[in-house]
Regions:
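Conserved class I S-adenosyl-L-methionine
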Residues: 2-65, 171
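Class I SAM-dependent methyltransferase SAM/SAH-binding core
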Residues: 71, 77-122
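A short acidic, Gly/Pro-enriched loop at the edge of an enzyme's catalytic core
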Residues: 121-132
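A short SAM/SAH-binding and catalytic strip from SAM-dependent methyltransferases
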Residues: 132-145
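A short glycine-rich, Lys/Arg-flanked "PGG" loop and its adjoining helix->strand segment in the class I
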Residues: 146-158
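Conserved beta-strand signature within the Rossmann-like core of class I S-adenosyl-L-methionine
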Residues: 160-167
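Short alpha-helix
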Residues: 175-190
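Core SAM-dependent methyltransferase catalytic element
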Residues: 202-227
Length: 227
């Protein structure tokens, strides 16, 4: 869900209503009202075959090889949830926008997927644990990102992964979280961090981009450590 950065189509996807940004304030947006046109953006709806193929390939490399349980936070209309389900994973999607979730449920009808209304910072999943927590363009909107990351880490099974797709968007008043900042937030957690830069792959966005876009894949130890 894209904030107004002053550059149409350059905004990120965030959950239905974020809090204050990690590095900059997230604008307030009525995501229920935006849901009908949300998938019109190439990297939101993944309607273009080349864009869809690009995201599918990246997601396959980020998620665990074996099919498992994936928690998609700020899932929006469920485009990444659908790719994960098609790759054999059982998906739980969480978003604050009922209108977005209505579209996600329709998109994943017949797949092993459930969608819940809730806050990405405190997902309403009880004591469940997952093999991967997938979050695209959401962390930057949340206050206390270090605390949020620790909570997401606590929801992983041993050997699980945090897959965080983030960036910095706009030139006049940039919003987002730089890769170096996110890597620093993950540094205190026991695990392995890999940063993958995405700005130079126009297939992901349906066009060339010149801002900072990246994915961080954080892998937890195979044996659980103390929170």
């Amino acid at each position: 869900m894209a904030p107004d950065t002053g550059e149409p189509g350059d905004g990120p996807v965030t959950q239905g209503a974020g809090g204050g940004g990690a590095d900059s304030a997230a604008p307030r947006v009525d995501w229920d009202a935006a849901a009908a046109a949300f998938d019109d953006e190439p990297d939101h709806g993944l309607r273009d075959a080349d864009v869809r193929r690009a995201w599918s390939g990246r997601l396959r490399s980020w998620l665990p090889v074996r099919p498992g349980d994936v928690l998609d936070l700020g899932c929006g209309t469920g485009s990444l949830s659908l790719l994960a389900a098609e790759q054999g994973h059982a998906v739980t999607g969480v978003d604050l926008s009922p209108a977005m979730l209505e579209r996600a449920r329709a998109k994943l009808a017949g797949h092993d997927a459930v969608f819940l209304t809730g806050d990405a910072a405190l997902p309403p999943v009880g004591e469940r644990c997952f093999d991967a927590v997938l979050v695209r363009h959401v962390l930057w909107t949340l206050p206390e990102p270090a605390r949020v990351l620790r909570h997401w880490r606590s929801m992983l099974r041993p050997g699980g992964r945090l897959v965080l797709v983030e960036g910095v968007w706009g030139s006049t008043a940039p919003v987002g979280i730089p890769a170096v900042r996110l890597a620093a937030l993950l540094a205190p957690l026991a695990g392995r961090t890999r940063v993958e830069h995405l700005s130079d792959d126009p297939a992901l966005w349906g066009r060339a981009v010149d801002d900072e876009r990246y994915a961080v894949v954080w892998s937890s130890p195979v044996t659980r450590t103390a929170p």
